[in-house]
């Protein structure tokens, strides 16, 4: 089975990744679940020997690693994880699980903020007190969401072993005429090894009719970074917004 999976992803080795189906892994009813072929591709392409996954959701990563015969540990906000190798973890407030620290690669496919309209706490799993919703990235306004996600990425990057890799799959969102780009707003620690475009298939929005001036979003982005062997220095790039009144600028004409 492992060899069949490797042959399938190897035949599609490209910076534009296009897998028409999500594969037989995980729960396809779990909103926001990514294609298992993406995780399988990363394992093949980067020779991953053990994988950690944050925002493990519907169990896709666990199932892929089972079929590719490598150790796996996941973490998710869900108090009742769907697999026994997924830990209940609040990525916002909890420390990085010790089980994550020695893995070859950390994979993340985070929620995309409140703008996309996919909440998890209280929707995909019960949240009777409302406490989990406060740490649910899927319920945070965009700026709060990106600030929180960037802090999580840096926290988990700091805990990674030198020489290990992190892959983050992310998407763009348009809501009420405003375009939000995760790739534009996300922090990039370490050394960037590769960026990928991942084509979207079988989306809920595919059946909708749009005006001619509207461009449907048909892709996601992913970066793969590596933590340098020098464990005492953390280098990163983070976007920031700045506003200037041109009336106060000496360069204005």
What are these regions (language model features)?
Residues 1-253:
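Class I S-adenosyl-L-methionine-dependent methyltransferase catalytic core
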């Amino acid at each position: 089975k492992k060899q069949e999976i490797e042959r399938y992803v190897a035949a599609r080795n490209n910076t534009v990744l296009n897998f028409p189906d999500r594969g037989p892994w995980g729960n396809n009813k779990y909103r926001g679940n990514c294609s298992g072929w993406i995780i399988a591709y990363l394992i093949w392409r980067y020779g991953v020997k053990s994988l950690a996954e944050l925002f493990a959701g519907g169990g896709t990563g666990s199932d892929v690693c089972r079929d590719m015969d490598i150790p796996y540990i996941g973490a998710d906000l869900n108090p009742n994880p769907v697999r026994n190798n997924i830990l209940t973890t609040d990525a916002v407030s909890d420390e990085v699980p010790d089980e994550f620290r020695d893995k070859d690669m950390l994979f993340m496919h985070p929620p995309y903020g409140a703008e996309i309209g996919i909440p998890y706490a209280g929707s995909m799993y019960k949240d009777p007190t409302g406490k989990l919703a406060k740490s649910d990235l899927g319920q945070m306004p965009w700026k709060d969401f990106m600030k929180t996600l960037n802090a999580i990425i840096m926290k988990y990057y700091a805990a990674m072993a030198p020489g290990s890799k992190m892959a983050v799959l992310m998407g763009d969102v348009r809501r009420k005429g405003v375009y939000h780009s995760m790739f534009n707003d996300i922090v990039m620690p370490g050394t960037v090894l590769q960026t990928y475009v991942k084509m979207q298939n079988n989306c809920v929005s595919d059946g909708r009719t749009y005006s001619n001036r509207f461009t449907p979003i048909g892709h996601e982005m992913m970066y793969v970074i590596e933590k340098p062997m020098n464990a005492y220095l953390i280098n990163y790039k983070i976007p920031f917004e700045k506003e200037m009144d041109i009336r106060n600028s000496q360069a204005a004409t």
